[in-house]
């Protein structure tokens, strides 16, 4: 299903009546999309349940792909909202914090993972759609990284399905190691929703199944999105692009984590002087 930002106007009005904060944010995002000249293609929307909780598992290629990941649920009839899990720092920010809380998103405190997990399970049991990134962090290669088991464990604990989602094209707008292209990027964004995966396996096996399904869905979306210009930063190495290979991306991530650790240690040392 092809969609333009203008087609969301009536939906925003209906959502604002039900959840004023969420509806207002969607209206603002819709305006941004229209200004950016984005074009959307959505497939598999029928795979989202019309009622009840579900884990929305999403690939992670850029900083704003979450704004697109909720679009299939918004356009579903009846329209539904996704409560995204996001790092605690976003909730502590003086601007984004109040917004995230008003939208009833779920903070992830890495020093207290159990509390975040429990909050997500409660939301799922209450019938919410909870958005999760199984890769945890952005993939510089734009291929799927190794998955954490959190999505599977949540689905098992809450006894709800996992709904795979692939967002493709968002990395062209804003991703790691590359400048933002927020002004009039005019790029196509593809969003695909896979068939529900029931939580009938142990966490390790369920996580492996989820990754396999998402890999297949990713390749389908990539094939439909092409052809790809050779050497472009946003195109995976496998498809002839300039993105790092998964191995190279893993090395960059290790270096990034080491640099962050060194900076934290330096700040701690400075505080004690």
Where are these regions (language model features)?
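Non-catalytic C-terminal accessory region of glycerolipid acyltransferases
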Residues: 2-9, 13-21, 114-273
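Alpha-helical membrane-targeting segments
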Residues: 13-39, 92-102, 177-186
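Structural motif corresponding to alpha-helix initiation and N-cap regions
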Residues: 42, 93, 114-117
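Catalytic core of membrane glycerolipid acyltransferases/transacylases, capturing the structured
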Residues: 50-111
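A short, flexible N-terminal coil/short beta segment enriched in small residues
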Residues: 1-13, 61-62, 71, 76
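Short, basic, glycine/proline-bearing loop/turn elements
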Residues: 29, 101-107, 134-138
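Helix-to-loop junction immediately C-terminal to a conserved catalytic motif
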Residues: 22, 29-60
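Short, flexible loop segments at the rims of nucleotide/cofactor-binding pockets, characterized by
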Residues: 31-37, 107-111, 141
């Amino acid at each position: 299903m092809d969609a333009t930002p203008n087609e969301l106007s009536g939906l925003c009005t209906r959502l604002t009546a039900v959840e004023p904060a969420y509806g207002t944010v969607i209206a603002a995002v819709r305006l941004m999309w229209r200004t950016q000249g984005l074009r959307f293609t959505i497939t598999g929307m029928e795979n989202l349940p019309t009622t009840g909780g579900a884990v929305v598992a999403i690939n992670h290629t850029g900083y704003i792909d979450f704004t697109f990941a909720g679009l299939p649920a918004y356009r579903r009839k009846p329209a539904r909202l996704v409560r995204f899990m996001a790092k605690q720092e976003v909730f502590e920010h003086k601007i984004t914090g109040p917004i995230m809380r008003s939208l009833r998103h779920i903070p992830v405190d890495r020093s207290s993972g159990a509390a975040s997990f429990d909050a997500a399970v409660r939301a799922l049991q209450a019938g919410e759609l909870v958005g999760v990134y199984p890769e945890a962090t952005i993939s510089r290669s734009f291929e799927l990284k190794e998955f954490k088991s959190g999505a599977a464990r949540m689905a098992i604990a809450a006894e709800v399905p996992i709904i795979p989602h692939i967002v493709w094209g968002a990395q062209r707008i804003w991703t790691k190691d590359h400048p933002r292209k927020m002004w009039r990027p005019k790029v196509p964004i593809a969003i695909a929703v896979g068939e529900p995966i029931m939580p009938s396996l142990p966490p390790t096996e369920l996580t492996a199944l989820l990754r396999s399904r998402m890999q297949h869905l990713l390749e389908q979306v990539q094939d439909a999105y092409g052809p790809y210009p050779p050497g472009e930063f946003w195109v995976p190495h496998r498809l002839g692009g300039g993105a790092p290979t998964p191995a190279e991306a893993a090395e960059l991530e290790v270096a990034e984590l080491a640099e962050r650790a060194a900076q934290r240690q330096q700040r701690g040392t400075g505080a004690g002087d």
